[in-house]
Amino acid sequence: MCKRVLTLAALLAVCLLANGCNAAAPMWMGANVKVSANAPWESAAAAQSLDALAGTGARKALLVAFVWQANPQSNDPVLGSDSSLEAMRAALRQSHRSGLQPTLKVHVWIPGHWAGEVAPADQAAWFAAYQKALLPLAQLAEDEHAEALVVGTELRKLQDAPQWPELVAAVRKVYRGKLLYVADGMEHAETFRYWSLFDAVGTSLYPRLSDAAGARATEMNAAAQRLQDLGQRVGKPVWVAELGLRSARGSLAAPWESPEQRTAAVDTRLQLQVLQQWRKVLQAHGVDGIALWCWYTDPAAGGPGDSDFTVQGKPAQQVLAR
């Protein structure tokens, strides 16, 4: 009997090690890292902040690089001054030194607007300029061994554009890692028709939620099931590339609202409870990983008196733990 048990145990061990019998990998946790005005990517402060992020147990850093344009109708996006190749090279290298797996994540920045409003007057001209701004970042991601590259984030008015295949093909000529697009929430992720071009389904996740924990759990499970179904339908892993909640009272009614849009009393307990609940639910539905929004290069950002999204120095920082 003892010999039989040992034999079964050995077979199980071999099975788990074999490619055809994989145990479910643990869901990774990470954060979107934004540069602070007082802590540029090349600074010692930014290095300290990335070290602190790694110290939470986070595995990945999604380094936000901004492509700038003057207004939503502009046709000429360009790489932002705070996201120069030299700056982003420093960000990637410091992430590696800190023990984090870096992703370069491209966002469009429009003063007074957000990326979902990008609606160029000449779509073909916009994509040509965007590709010109993006390709040096793709080469940088290749040179500095970024794990992944996000080539677009929440471009809801452009997600059906016919230029995506050409853009992705151009990027793949210089970058061999994982390529992602991050859709603006589940509805846009479900209708995006180009997932076959990418290595994972990427989405942000800021749905309205109920105050009552029970109702909130039902809403979260429904959202997570939709993401799981989408991943299975297109045959790709799912990255929740942005998940956030302000540490502010009343933030469940509109989780996407910034402090500039609404002033509210600090509530770090709510942020912790909701992000913990999201982590549990998404893991149960097979999501590959979650990147919280957000983390700043200023190591003093956040703290118990802060009502912004960052989890730095707040109880919700523990959501990143392994």
Predicted regions: what is each one?
Residues 1-8:
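Bacterial N-terminal signal peptides that target proteins for export
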Residues 8-19:
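Bacterial N-terminal signal peptides
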Residues 22-52:
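Boundary/entry segment of secreted carbohydrate-active catalytic domains
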Residues 41, 255-257, 269-274, 281-322:
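Aromatic-rich peripheral "rim/lid" segments of glycoside hydrolase catalytic domains that contact
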Residues 44-49, 132-137, 183-193, 222-227, ...:
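Alpha-helical scaffolding within the catalytic cores
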Residues 56-74, 87-158, 250, 293-298:
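Substrate-binding cleft and catalytic face of glycoside hydrolase catalytic domains
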Residues 84-85, 105, 179-180, 188-257, ...:
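Glycoside hydrolase catalytic-domain groove-lining segments
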Residues 105-108, 148-154, 158-160, 168-189, ...:
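Aromatic-lined carbohydrate-recognition surfaces of secreted/lumenal glycan-active proteins
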